[in-house]
Amino acid sequence: MAEQGYDSITIDLQHGLVGYEVATTMLQAMRASAVTPLVRVPWLDPAAIMKSLDAGAYGVICPMINTREEAERLVSYVRYPPNGVRSFGPTRANFSAGSDYGQHADREVLCFAMIETAEAVANLEAITSTPGLDGVYIGPADLTLGLTGRRYPTGFDREEPEVVEVIQTILQEAHKAGIRACLHNGTPAYAAKAIGWGFDLVTISNDVRLLAGAAQASVATARKLIDEQVSPLPASATEGY
């Protein structure tokens, strides 16, 4: 995946089916490429955040940040004193980023808060203005659930005007605060549309959907080509059987 032209790749420890040990080997593999490795942590948990950074992640995406206080805690877990409370123990980061990692980590490690609830939207200005926060990352599926309940089917690429309006408001508030606006997408087409709106970071899809989509397309193409090449035997060839 890291060799396919992506700017960054996110290891998903929230909804993904991997744990810390596997994530560490994935970070090791990405080290040979030019991609920026990010980790979406399971929750606002200092241990998960700090261990992900110690393993060599260059940024964390934290789900369900709903208040300024939670955003401040997130930043504090990502930054070393005096900017935060991150414990020093960059077991692998020291090797991947240099023995002076502790001196420049705070300037390089990215900290993204996920906005995906009605509460977070209500506290948007307070969250986006949190010192040390690099950006907000919209989770459109949970955001739609939080704003509208089960009125609409779940999914990523939202077209409902009321949801799109909130997504664009989050984008505007992030840029007003001077931080990055990021959006999770399900398709390249919607990702391109989001870039057109002004988003700084977008996803195209996840590995499971990419694999399933490619497999489905390959099977469909093979069946179509086979059907075109194989024609029924003429009636004379089947006489006597």
What residue ranges belong to the model's regions?
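Expand to "…catalyze enediolate/carbanion chemistry for C-C bond making/breaking, isomerization
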Residues: M1-Y241
